[in-house]
Amino acid sequence: FLMGVHQGHATVRNNQFDKALHDNHTVATVLREAGYKTALIGKYGLQGKGQDAESWEAYPTKRGFDEFFGYVAHRDGHVHYPSHPWPIGNSESHRTGKQVWWNEREVSSELTRCYTTDLFTARSKQWIIDHRGTAPEQPFFLYLAFDTPHAALQVPTCAYPEGQGLNGGVRWLGRSGKMINTATGTIDSYRHPDYI
């Protein structure tokens, strides 16, 4: 999808996790050249070798995205609470904390009790609100790549807040330790009343 070619012609083969996405056109570069504002929020896993946004050869902002917020490494997207280790994980990479990047800054230490589905939803909603406030006439492309359900099969901390749309439900607060309005309670604990 990102390269705009049939999967039989794609350069990422055989689940080669974290292989660098070739320096070629992506849907984001094409749309950005056409005047769109672009963002990728969620799980990426196509960065190549390196340790940070500057050294990763194919970091999302180097492949056509104006903004990136999410997991860069494939393995990090297996756990849904980035600042909390998953103690029953079946590998060391599952049991340790994960890295979430916001453009060129690693922010996982600010994400206490943030469940990634809520986090990526809230960040996406806020990105749309911000874009509408700064450039309402400019078209946009938002690629939202959730990491759930996957490996850890963790659940949220609480029931979803009332309301809907950009100003209701899950919302971005943007404060360290309280990035989203559902970052409360005990991690991996919410059970819907119908299933108790």
Language model features with spans:
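Formylglycine-dependent sulfatase
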Residues: 1-196
